[in-house]
Amino acid sequence: VRVGVAPAPTTNAAPVATDDLVTAQPGRTVAAEVLANDLDADGDALSLVGTPTCDDDALTLSVRANRVMAVLPQTEGLYTVHYTVTDSRGGTDVGTLTIRVTAQAPPVSPVGVDDHVTVDQVAADGTVTVPVLDNDKDADGSPWDLTVTADDPRAQVTDQSIRATIGEEQYLVLYTVTDVDGRTGSAVVVVPARSELRPRVDS
């Protein structure tokens, strides 16, 4: 059996941004996951670069955790936002995010996404603090505006993060996120047993 290693391609296909639409009520802060439907033929990881732009200065725009953050005005209407996506090799494309601001926007429940604790997250005292909101979703708002609650004696909620202690057995911490409309979603933090964690070598 002969095994060969293919050389890395010398050409790079630029990413392709796909249009996005977000609908939300006036005055909200939304976090649009615009990269979720963008494509890269080479399979390169995509990220946002620069600050998104809008011809209407009624929106305040920024980027957080590869999401387009927009503080919406009280004025209803359609707002067009442009953002730049880049791959890991310098290819770029400009995408369009349309934000429909309307008081008639139906409330959407947030979505909690499970978190799995890794050895790098565990502190020297055997505790772990998991920023659970970082991978949660709120289609008509921002996940970082959600309220976190957990009814588990083995865990504490601190600054909207879940703090737990590594034990002899794996366990799950069920938590709930609640948005400004009172709608909820749930997910779990998977806390591994001490024996499941690989030893960490400090440099």
Give the location of each predicted region:
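Charged, amphipathic alpha-helical scaffolding segments
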Residues: 72-78, 84, 166
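Short secondary-structure boundary micro-motifs
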Residues: 5-7, 53-55, 67-68
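Strand-loop-strand motifs at the edges of beta-sheets in extracellular beta-sandwich domains
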Residues: 57-72, 152-172
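Extracellular interdomain linkers/hinges and stalk-like, low-complexity segments
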Residues: 1-43, 80-84, 88-142, 146, ...
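Aromatic-enriched hydrophobic runs in primary sequence
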Residues: 54, 59-61, 91-95, 154-157, ...
